Structures are given as structure tokens and as C-alpha cells.
Amino acid sequence: MYGELGNKLVQHAKRTQSLAHLPPYQTELVRTVAREVRDLDRDLAHLLAPFEGSFNPSQEPAVACALLVDHLCIRRNKRCLLAYHRVRTEKLEELCWKGIDVLEHQQATAAGDDGGQMGGQNSESTGAQGTSGNESSLSPEEEEYFREYSDMLATYKGQWTDIDLTGSLEPPKDLFIDVRVLKDAGEIQTEYGVINLTKNSQLYVRHGDVERLIAQGFLEQLS
């Protein structure tokens, strides 16, 4: 039934809004909805072809009804496509402002997936097939958009070097906090000196010095 696939895209978009990350791009579903739009457009042209530009809806109510249904289906599919891509674009911009490098996160995830799959390459008898780690959760257009938006944001932030425009608008409750290191990040320079971020270590640091690292997933704030 026309419109069902477009509704699936809307459901994906709604779920994306409640996630902290960006789920995989629905390439096949988007292509199928776009193909449905083209098919409906061909149906419109086929229905209008016999009239050679002199169609009168009052004289051909059945044809007029078919044209209306096809046209409304096309418009709805287009709105679903636009809504899906708009939500993903807003999520990319949100992650960019939080300082999360989506492309770098994908590469790290892909490397982990590849390592986990090596042990099971010879176990064909199980019939299980893992997802390729090389698959990107972004479309090529989204990757390009993220790079260009990141560059634009960096240029914009460069005008105010003394102000962190991507920082939280809410002041921290405590000036210093306890954190646990989730991933090795090496040494970082802070106002109070150099701290070494080694995985599983716990530190008592100034909130402003590690706020970005918490957002990027390197650190976890302890209650």
C-alpha cells in the first residue's frame, strides 16, 4: 500500500530523536520510497497522456480521483523523506556542537567489530553472519555535510578563543568532580597542570577541564 514505507521512515526518525547516537542510515528504504515516488509520477503522466493537456476533472471524475490519490501519495512520501533527513541532520549538528566526532567514533567501532569477527571466520557451520565493520551509519552525503559543518563551526568558534561556545549553558554544581577514565586519552594540559588519563583510573579534577571529555565518552562522572 502506498505510504507504508514512508511511514516506516517517520518511525525511524522518531526513534532517532530519543537516541544519544545516530543509527544506521536506511539506504534501501530511502531508495524504495524514492522509487515509489517516481512510479506514481509515471502513473500520473500515463493517466493524463490521452487528454493531451485538455483534461477536465468534472467530465472525468474517476480519472480525477485517481490523479488526486497519486498526487497526495507523492506529497506524503516527499514529506516523509524530508522529515527523515531533517531529523538526522539536526542530530548531526547536535553531536557536532557537543564535540563528538561521529566519523572518528565510527572508525573506532569498525575496528572493534573487525577484531571481534576474526575469531569466528572459520565457524561456518553455525550459519551466523556478522555485520561488516566497514559499514558506515552515515550516508556519503551525511559524511560530507558533517565535515563541512564541523569546519564551519570551528571557524565560527575561532572568532572567540576565550569562550567555549559549545560548552553547557548550565553552570556546574561542583567546581571539582570525581571521574573514571573509560578510554585511554594520554596526557592533557589543564590550568592546574598535566593529568594523565589512563583507562580505569579515577581522578579528582576541575569540571571545566574535563567537560568535553565527558561528552566525548572518554570519562564518566561519578556520583
From Swiss-Prot:
Residues 110-142 are annotated as: Disordered. Residues 122-139 have a biased composition (Polar residues). It is found in: Nucleus. Keywords: DNA replication, Nucleus. GO terms for cellular component: CMG complex; GINS complex; nuclear replication fork. GO terms for biological process: DNA strand elongation involved in mitotic DNA replication; double-strand break repair via break-induced replication; mitotic DNA replication initiation. It holds the Pfam family PSF1_C. Its main location: nucleus. InterPro entries: GINS_A, GINS_bundle-like_dom_sf, GINS_Psf1, PSF1_C. Belongs to the GINS1/PSF1 family. The GINS complex plays an essential role in the initiation of DNA replication. Component of the GINS complex which is a heterotetramer of sld5, psf1, psf2 and psf3. This is DNA replication complex GINS protein psf1. It comes from Emericella nidulans (strain FGSC A4 / ATCC 38163 / CBS 112.46 / NRRL 194 / M139) (Aspergillus nidulans). The lineage of its organism: Eukaryota, Fungi, Dikarya, Ascomycota, Pezizomycotina.
